[in-house]
Structure formats: C-alpha cells, structure tokens
A protein has these predicted regions:
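Short, well-ordered secondary-structure micro-motifs
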Residues: 66-68, 118-121, 156
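Short, conserved, surface-exposed binding loops centered on an aromatic residue
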Residues: 45-48, 64, 74-76, 97-102
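Extracytoplasmic substrate-binding proteins
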Residues: 1-63, 84-86, 141-178
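Conserved N-terminal glycine/acidic-rich loop preference
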Residues: 57, 72-77, 92-93, 117-128, ...
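A short helix->loop->beta-strand "cap" motif at the edges of active sites that frequently abuts
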Residues: 135, 139-141
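Acidic/His-rich segments in extracytoplasmic proteins that coordinate ligands and/or metal ions
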Residues: 1-19, 85, 92-134
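Alpha-helical, coiled-coil/dimerization segments enriched in small aliphatic residues
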Residues: 64-91
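Active-site phosphate/pyrophosphate- and oxyanion-stabilizing loops and adjacent acidic/basic residues
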Residues: 14, 72-73, 97, 161
Length: 178
C-alpha cells in the first residue's frame, strides 16, 4: 500500500480500511474521492481535441513532474497535456530554454509550506525568471502555486480540483475544493 497516487488511492484506502477494521471510514473517504473525481469529469466531459498545455514544476527549480508522476495522473483526469510527460522520466530536469520553447498555456508549481516563503513569493519568483515574460502562461496570468501535499495521497481530490480549475477555468467555475 502506498496511498500515494490518485489512480490507486481508492483501492489502497479500502485495503487499509480492511486491515484496520475501519471499512466504514474507508468507504466514506472513497465516496468523497469519487464525488470530486466525478464532478471534475462531468464538467470536462465535452472537452475534445487539443488540450491546454502545462509545465508542472516540483519543489526544485526546473524539476518537472513527468510521465506517471502524481500530477501526470491528475492531468489525465483534468484534461490537460503535461509537457514533461514526453521526456520519459517521472521527474526530469529541464532548462529555462526548454520551458520557453514549449511555451505552456499554464504553469503550475508545487511548493511546500515554509514560514520563510509564501506561495505568493514562490509565484513571483517564477514570474520574474529571465525569458518567462514571453510565455503565454505568464501573459495570460495562468501561473499557479499549489501546496504539494494536495497532489499526492488522501488530499489529492483537492489537488485535482485545483488543477482542473487552472486548466479549464470556465468549465470549472463555481467548484471549490475547500
């Protein structure tokens, strides 16, 4: 059991509930998870064709979230194209030039909550990177910073909603993961 990635979370939670004698609590959580997954899926059901592109950066600068990472799994449900998925690694290192050449529609940075730096400060650091002023995501004000704890594990339904709202703000308006 890892209770880590969204695509295996429901199974892992049910198994954990069985192991601990907490089947009812596990089932309540699975209903909660599926409620949010189904809501996002229904809001995005009419989206076809090309998907919005996203560069998703992990905790370190230019450490992308690639193929089969937690974000990549959520991206499939949220109908976005993870630009780093084609690089063949889960967490590939990329360069500023690569990000600029890919010109993502959305930038999402996962960050940890630390008292010395706010999420707004992390966002400002991204906005002021050399050359990033040319990116569509920056020009269109579609740069987001998200607590990384919302991408993996039991909190990931909230991360799914945030990601879907970042990729498809019109279709997901009115949905709040709070």
């Amino acid at each position: 059991l890892d209770c880590y990635k969204f695509d295996t979370l429901e199974r892992d939670i049910r198994e954990l509930g069985t192991m601990t004698g907490k089947e009812d609590e596990a089932e309540r959580y699975c209903l909660f998870l599926n409620k949010w997954k189904d809501l996002v899926s229904s809001r995005l059901s009419n989206i076809t064709g090309s998907l919005p592109t996203a560069y998703v950066e992990g905790y370190s600068a230019y450490s992308a979230q690639g193929k089969d990472s937690g974000v990549d799994i959520l991206m499939g449900i949220a109908k976005g194209k993870n630009l780093a998925a084609d690089l063949g690694e889960q967490w590939p290192k990329v360069t500023p030039e690569w990000v600029i050449s890919e010109n993502p529609a959305v930038i999402l940075k996962t960050a940890s909550l630390k008292p010395e730096k706010t999420l707004d400060q992390v966002r400002e650091e991204i906005l002021t990177r050399t050359g990033f002023e040319t990116l569509n995501a920056v020009k269109e004000k579609r740069v987001y910073v998200l607590n990384g704890d919302l991408i993996y594990g039991p909190r990931s339904p909230a991360g799914l909603v945030y990601l879907a709202k970042a990729l498809h703000p019109e279709e997901c308006s009115g949905i709040s993961p709070e």
